[in-house]
Curated annotation (Swiss-Prot):
Cited InterPro entries: 4-carb_acid_sugar_kinase_N, 4-carb_acid_sugar_kinase_N_sf, NBD_C, NBD_C_sf, OiaK
Residue numbers binding ATP: S291, G403, G404, D405, S406, G451
Lineage: Bacteria, Pseudomonadati, Pseudomonadota, Betaproteobacteria, Burkholderiales
EC number: 2.7.1.231
Gene: oiaK
Residues that coordinate or bind substrate: D30, R78
Swiss-Prot/TrEMBL keywords: ATP-binding, Carbohydrate metabolism, Kinase, Nucleotide-binding, Transferase
GO molecular function, one term: kinase activity
Swiss-Prot/TrEMBL catalytic activity: 3-oxoisoapionate + ATP = 3-oxoisoapionate 4-phosphate + ADP + H(+)
Identification of the protein by name: 3-oxo-isoapionate kinase
């Protein structure tokens, strides 16, 4: 596929104006963020599929109408050495699909460090796979309450905006705390690559394309693009699309998907009002949560107060080689008993950043003989095993996984090949349909929820297929 601009449509939606083939291919640095990006495209009217392994011709043949292909990954919690080993092959396989934009999809809170989930390292690897001479970066996503102004990232919680280094959750992230909101400075710790900015004032100017062309060079600089509102969102999408040339690599949040969709919509290439169908209610759902977020903690508390059965996974026991299997058995038994009575269940490892399971996690891991990272993955595998056994023992049609690492572990254990969007719930956490060669898993309805997504009624909303109380 080349970089020529599709013909200007005459009126309404004009699908024939699209260039042939894929429009975008992306690798998500965690599973929940990958579904967020898929939702943004699908809701806008761009058929999208999310693969949970490298996309093969055989798998993609099941989705002949797609214009966007994603692959869910786990690099946000990985070392730079892991990235050096794993990302080149993955990104090469996505680049080979021929889309003009290859994206490394990052979280809209940009949580990363030189040691863990290095976005800079991912960029240095990714730019080798596309011919472009700049690497745009779109992080702001107003729909998710993320805003970038003059290179600084802000996020709103409960109607209050915070600079990211003062955000009540991200500034205290247990692995990658954000202590710098200026993304130029934060990213400069992770790469020696030149970093530039198109700020919100330049973006609205008449000569912004000239400015981009002046920045383009063989060293392929990273160019951050401010996004504050719907106007700057659409302008960012226009800039990326019109300056894609023969193909570009970008490390961006789902703000990129929202930006491209806004531009395409403005040109009449997409329906004027983005939407997804609603879902039907189910009697009961099962959820597992490895999230430490106060947002998820509030959601667990709401669910408990509204008739859900909540069961804590005891981490010292779960990590102990002698007690781990028994702890999983205990949790599964309690959860199964509730589900057979038609009661929804949440199995969780923590409730918020001040939970002793979080504040004392290093000591718990050390006592079990694990480094922090290895212990965290073992907890994710324990939650995945709980979900697998619940699905094998109870008739369940809809499940939830909260937390990016947990989502990856669960999807792997369940043998899911791909996901597509079934229905809309809240921005960033759609209801998905699982595609699997395993008949018992094919058609499973699943929600993968990031820690910061949703209000307190989230689990009730998933069960009802709509906002609780609506």
């Amino acid at each position: 596929m080349n970089g020529t601009e599709p013909a200007e449509p005459t009126n309404g939606t004009n699908a024939t104006a699209w260039p042939a083939g894929l429009l975008l291919a992306y690798y998500g640095d965690d599973f929940t963020g990958s579904t967020d990006a898929m939702e943004a495209m699908q809701a806008a009217g761009v058929p999208t599929v999310l693969c949970l392994q490298k996309p093969t011709p055989e798998l993609l043949a099941r989705f002949p109408e797609v214009r966007c292909v994603g692959m869910a990954g786990s690099s946000r919690g990985r070392s730079s050495a892991w990235m050096d080993d794993e990302l080149p092959d993955v990104l090469a396989s996505l680049a080979a699909l021929g889309a003009p934009i290859l994206q490394y999809k990052v979280c809209s809170t940009f949580d990363s460090s030189p040691e863990v989930g290095s976005i800079g390292r991912a960029i240095d690897i990714g730019v080798r796979h596309m011919p472009g001479n700049w690497s745009p970066m779109v992080i702001g996503a107003p729909r998710l309450k993320r805003y970038q102004m003059f290179g600084n990232l802000f996020a709103a919680v409960d109607g209050v905006g915070y600079r990211l280094d003062r955000h009540p959750t991200m500034s205290r992230h247990p692995v990658t705390p954000m202590n710098e909101a200026d993304l130029r400075l934060h990213l400069a710790r992770q790469t020696a690559r030149r970093i530039e900015l198109i700020d919100m004032l330049e973006l609205r100017g008449a000569d912004v394309a000239t400015r981009v062309r002046a920045l383009c060079a063989p060293d392929m600089p990273v160019v951050l693009i401010d996004v504050l509102d719907e106007e700057t969102l659409a302008e960012a999408g226009r800039l990326v699309w019109e300056q894609r040339g023969e193909g570009i690599f970008t490390a961006s949040s789902s703000g990129l998907q929202y930006a491209l969709a806004a531009h395409w919509r403005a040109r009449g290439l997409l329906p004027p009002t983005p939407s997804l169908p609603a879902a039907d209610p189910v009697q009961a759902i099962a959820a597992v949560s490895g999230s430490c977020s106060p947002v998820t903690a509030a959601q667990i508390g709401w669910a408990r107060a509204h008739g859900f059965h909540t069961e804590r996974l005891d981490l010292p026991r779960a990590l102990d080689s002698r007690d781990g299997a028994a702890e999983i058995e205990r949790v599964v038994t309690a959860a199964t008993q509730a589900l057979t009575r038609g009661i929804s269940v949440i199995v969780h490892s923590a409730e918020g950043p001040d939970d002793p399971a979080v504040t004392g996690f290093d000591a718990i891991a050390s006592a079990a003989g694990f480094a922090r990272h290895d212990a965290a993955r073992k907890v994710g595998r324990a939650l995945a095993e709980v979900m697998r056994r619940l699905l094998d023992s109870v008739e369940l049609t809809r499940v939830v996984v909260a937390g990016g690492d947990s989502s990856g572990e669960v999807a792997s254990v369940l043998g899911i090949d791909a996901l597509s969007v079934m229905a809309g719930l809240v921005p960033g956490a759609p209801l998905c349909r699982a595609w699997s060669a395993e008949p018992r898993r094919d058609g499973l309805q699943i929600v993968l929820k990031g820690g910061q997504i949703g209000d307190a009624t989230f689990f009730g909303m998933v069960r009802e297929g709509r906002l609780a109380g609506a």
